[in-house]
Amino acid sequence: MEVKPLANIKSAIKRAELNVKQNEKNSAQKSAMRTAIKAFEANPSEELFRAASSAIDKAETKGLIHKNKASRDKARLASKLA
């Protein structure tokens, strides 16, 4: 995806390009997390729970979601497993 920045300063143009790349990467990571959660909710199993929990932890580690949200999501998934 090409960036057509409004900025005139070279460093600001570079930052705009970086923001686009980081946004794509973060969106993909968050989407993978949501997909893992939906897969577990569709068919609750121990294996899918571990995959969803791992995806949530990765998103938390990368700063995509808050640690409290990660904990809450994992607790809700665990209650569906039990």
From Swiss-Prot:
This is Small ribosomal subunit protein bS20. Binds directly to 16S ribosomal RNA. Pfam families: Ribosomal_S20p. Keywords: Ribonucleoprotein, Ribosomal protein, RNA-binding, rRNA-binding. It comes from Streptococcus suis (strain 05ZYH33). Signal peptide: none annotated. One of its GO terms (molecular function) is structural constituent of ribosome. Belongs to the bacterial ribosomal protein bS20 family. One of its GO terms (biological process) is translation. One of its GO terms (cellular component) is small ribosomal subunit.
